Amino acid sequence: MKFLITLIITTTAMISNYETQKYDVILSDNNFEIRFYDSSLKARVASDRSANGNFYKLFQFISGNNSKGEKIAMTTPVYMKNDENQNTMEFVMPSSYNLETISQPKDKDVIIFKSEAKYYACVKYGGYSNSKKFNTHSKELLKKLNELSINIKGDIFYVSYNSPYKVFNRRNEAMVEIIYEN
């Protein structure tokens, strides 16, 4: 029992030290937010594999399966999108990297790219996420955007900020790109 408590505390401490992608909050209403994200460097895997398979490929990349054999720090959040044809997962790269300095992946399925600056809307929720919770919060997100007469661009996706080992105070989001004029 003592070991388990130590493991949970240590893991939580390690996870809380992850760099988190920066954004500006434009509008906040309870668990709903409109945000502006500047461009950022990301690594992406898109495949017909499960999310676990995509995570493994991205984790291998940041663990040294890259042109420099270097370990790249884990950051938050992790972006996930599932549709009928493929699952996509993206890791945000640490802000100290750019396209010229980031190690190149050895795995051809891992793509490095610079995202565009965009507006997003999200609904935040806690606990361990599952498809039922995600669908509930996605509907809440669409309802709020409809109330505000804000149009979406693309599909809603899932964003996770925590390791699966974190038990308390988990942070998840249903998020979508929006057409927004500030």
Across the structure, where does each feature detected by a protein language model lie?
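A solvent-exposed interaction/effector surface
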Residues: 2-182
